[in-house]
Amino acid sequence: DVQMIQSPSSLSASLGDIVTMTCQASQGTNINLNWFQQKPGKAPKLLIYGASILEDGVPSRFSGSRYGTDFTLTISSLEDEDMATYFCLQHTYLPYTFGGGTKLEIKR
């Protein structure tokens, strides 16, 4: 199975900050990767697909990039509403696999 190693597991940042999180695939090529945001009690929301394509309606402060088997989600100019857990999903190789998640908290 392809393991998606996500880091960090938690992150605390201030409003207006730029934050990044990464997922690294343990193996494979041409991995199709999505990023999701999940808030407590809510269904996951697709942010980015194809590693870097922003889903319709998602603010442009979210961006995704890839370098080989390393994938990065960046949030620029952090807002209160961005407090959530973020996770990646590879859906190229069966079984599809998720990263462990990054819990983003806002520093007060």
Curated annotation (Swiss-Prot):
An additional note in the Swiss-Prot or TrEMBL entry is: This chain was isolated from myeloma proteins that bind beta(2-1)-fructofuranosyl moieties (inulin).
Framework-1: annotated span: 1-23
Q: Which domain of life is it from?
A: Eukaryota
Q: Does the entry feature the keyword Metal-binding, yes or no?
A: no
Which parts of the sequence are annotated with region: Framework-4?
98-108
Q: GO CC terms for this protein?
A: immunoglobulin complex
Extract the ranges annotated as region (Complementarity-determining-3): 89-97
UniProt cross-references to Gene3D superfamilies, sorted A to Z? Immunoglobulins
Extract the ranges annotated as region (Complementarity-determining-2): 50-56
Q: Which UniProt keywords apply?
A: Adaptive immunity, Disulfide bond, Immunity, Immunoglobulin
Give the residue ranges for region: Complementarity-determining-1: 24-34
The upper taxonomy is: Eukaryota, Metazoa, Chordata, Craniata, Vertebrata
Q: Name one GO biological process term.
A: adaptive immune response
The record's disulfide annotation reads 23-88
Per the record, which residues fall in region Framework-3?
57-88
Q: What parts of the sequence cross the membrane?
A: none
Region described as Framework-2? 35-49
Q: What is this protein called?
A: Ig kappa chain V-V region W3082
InterPro entries from the xrefs?
A: Ig-like_dom, Ig-like_dom_sf, Ig-like_fold, Ig_sub, Ig_V-set, IgV_Light_Chain
